[in-house]
């Protein structure tokens, strides 16, 4: 399988998806036809989100079609060489994808050679479930099971920092809560600016920041760019 799972879409001082464009270009391998899954978009319309994505990827020769615009979404997925899943609210993304019957077809198409690109919520969707999203559950997705393309759970935008005087839980504490009720899981705290690239059977960590791996009953382990999962 070919996956590009990004923690986020924007870095300080850079344009939207700018840091991801070289990664995408290097993983296209001649692929040009993409479907975009915009359902995580809440404060922007799906048309706006699709057009924004298409404009950014056009210089790479990628032709982007919004899945909500086609008469036969299943046929569009089957024909797609690239499946792109944008960030936003993970619960809405999963709900809309499930209700349209897109989850199994997307997973099957990626397993048969389509490149999967997802940032934030899109990275969450590639995991076995969306249980490590940071998002508010604004809708009921009728279950948390997702695409299960990547075997570990990703927590995007990971940071353990708290504002001065803030008394709420750290991100690690929240992850530890999950591991109490689901000790079989492994959670990757993927900070902004980092990504996981899967190609030729190898999953490799990239990005400038330290990534953390959490397992039940164990201390967190720090990983740097180049680590192979």
Curated annotation (Swiss-Prot):
Its EC number is 3.4.13.21. It is found in: Cytoplasm. GO terms for molecular function: dipeptidase activity; serine-type peptidase activity. CDD domains: GAT1_Peptidase_E (cd03146). It catalyses: Dipeptidase E catalyzes the hydrolysis of dipeptides Asp-|-Xaa. It does not act on peptides with N-terminal Glu, Asn or Gln, nor does it cleave isoaspartyl peptides. The active site is at residues 120, 135, 157. GO terms for cellular component: cytoplasm. Hydrolyzes dipeptides containing N-terminal aspartate residues. May play a role in allowing the cell to use peptide aspartate to spare carbon otherwise required for the synthesis of the aspartate family of amino acids. Belongs to the peptidase S51 family. HAMAP family: Peptidase_E. This is Peptidase E. It comes from Salmonella paratyphi C (strain RKS4594). The gene is pepE.
């Amino acid at each position: 399988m070919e996956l590009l799972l990004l923690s986020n879409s924007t870095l300080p001082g850079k344009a939207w998806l700018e840091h991801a464009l070289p990664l995408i270009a290097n993983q296209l391998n001649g692929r040009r036809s993409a479907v975009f899954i915009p359902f995580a978009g809440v404060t922007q319309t799906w048309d706006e989100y699709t057009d924004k994505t298409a404009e950014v990827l056009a210089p790479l020769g990628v032709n982007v079609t919004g899945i909500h615009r086609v008469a036969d979404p299943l046929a569009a997925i089957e024909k797609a060489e690239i499946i792109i899943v944008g960030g936003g609210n993970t619960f809405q993304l999963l709900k809309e994808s499930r209700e349209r019957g897109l989850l199994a077809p997307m997973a099957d198409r990626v397993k048969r050679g389509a490149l999967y690109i997802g940032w934030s919520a899109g990275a969450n969707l590639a995991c076995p479930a969306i249980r490590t999203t940071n998002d508010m559950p604004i809708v009921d997705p009728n279950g948390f099971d997702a695409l299960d393309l990547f075997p570990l759970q990703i927590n995007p935008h990971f940071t353990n920092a708290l504002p001065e005087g803030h008394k709420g839980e750290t991100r690690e504490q929240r992850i530890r809560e999950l591991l109490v009720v689901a000790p079989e899981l492994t959670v990757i705290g993927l900070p902004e600016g980092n990504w996981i690239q899967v190609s030729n059977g190898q999953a490799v960590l990239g990005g400038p920041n330290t990534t953390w791996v959490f397992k039940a009953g164990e201390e967190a382990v720090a990983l740097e760019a180049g680590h192979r999962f």
